[in-house]
Amino acid sequence: MRQLSPRGVTEAISCNRRDFLGVVTGATAAISLFALSSGKSLGSPRKSKRKAVVVTFGGGCRDEETFMPEGQENIPHLLKELIPQSTFFTRVINRGILGHYVATASLATGVYETFDNFAAVPPDHPTVFEYFRRDLKRPLDDAWVVAPANGFNRIGGSNSRLFGPNYAANVILPKRLLKKALSSTSGARYEHLLVDNYETPLLAPEVRGNRIDLHLFSHLMKLSVSDFVAHALTLSSPDELSVYIARQLMRRYAPSLLWITLHDMDVAHSGSYSLYIEGIQRTDRLCAEVWQEIQRQPEYAGNTTLIILPDFGRDSDLDAGGNGFQHHRTGDALSRT
C-alpha cells in the first residue's frame, strides 16, 4: 500500500466536520456504517458483520505538535501506519463549546450541544448509539462507550423522547471501576491512573446513567477484581487502562459499535509541556494498538471502520488572551481546529 509523504498527508482528502458527521452519525449512521449484506433486512435482530470503532481524544492538540513538520515526530503511527490506509480529513473545526464532555457529545450526536460542560446531564439530541440500537434493533451488549471521566457518564443516551435510555449504550468508567476496587491503603500505588479530569470543577457531576458498576463489570468480563487491579498496576496512564478495557470488550462481546474516548493529553492543563507531548505520543501509539487489535480479532478483521478524531485544539501561543498549549479558552482558530 502506498505510503504518504508529509506533503502527501497535507494534500489528502479534506471535508467539512459537519458534512463528515452527517455521514457517520444521525439518521444515516445505521445505514452507512452497519448496513447488512444484500438480501438481509435492516430490521433483522441478528448482529451485522459490519462494525465500527470510534476513538476520540480530548484535551485537544495543535497542528504544530502533530501534523506540522516540527510535530510529526510525535505521531509516527498515525502518519506512517494509519493515514496511508485511510481517508484523511485535513480540516476539522469545532464551532461549538470548547468543553470536553459537551464537545464529545456533539461528536456523538452530530449536533452542537449547548449544555453546561460540567453538568450531569445527557445530550439533548439522539446519539449515534441510540440510532444504531433502535433502527437496527441491536441488543444492549452491541453498543459500548469507554469514557475517560465521571463527567462522561451520561453520554450513552440522550433526553430525546423518541430515543433515550431504552436505546442507550453501556458506559464504562475505567477509573471509577479501579477506584472502587482499591482499598484505602493501596490507592497511592495507582494514583497516576485515578485522576478524574484535569479541569476540576467546584462540583463534580453525580455518576448516573447507563453505566456499569464494578461487580457487574467483573461478571460481564469474566475477569476477577483482583486480576483487574493487578493488571492496572502494569499500566502507565488512564488511557492505557481505557484501551485495556476496550480490548476485553472486543474479545468478550465483539460489539458492533465501540466508542473510546482518550484523555491523557489534557494533562496540558497542569502547565507541563513535556507531559502534554507525552500524552500526544501515547495517544498516537494507542490508536495504532486499537487498529492492531481490530486486525487480530476474527470478528473485526476485514469488516471494521475505525474512526479517529479530536474534540478540538488548544490555544495559540500568540493569543494574548490565552495560555498557549495549556488551555483551550480563547476560541481562536487553533483552539477550534
Task: Spell out what each predicted region is.
Residues 1-16:
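N-terminal secretory signal peptides
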Residues 14, 34-59:
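C-terminal segment of N-terminal export signals and the immediately downstream linker at the start
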Residues 65-102, 142-144:
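Short, structured active-site-proximal loop/turn typified by the sulfatase FGly-forming signature C/S-X-P-X-R
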Residues 69, 158, 220-230, 243-289, ...:
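Active-site His/acidic residue clusters
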Residues 102-109, 323-337:
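Substrate-binding rim/cap in mid-to-C-terminal beta-strand-loop elements of soluble/periplasmic
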Residues 114-121, 162-196:
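Acidic, His- and aromatic-enriched active-site or binding-groove loops in soluble protein domains
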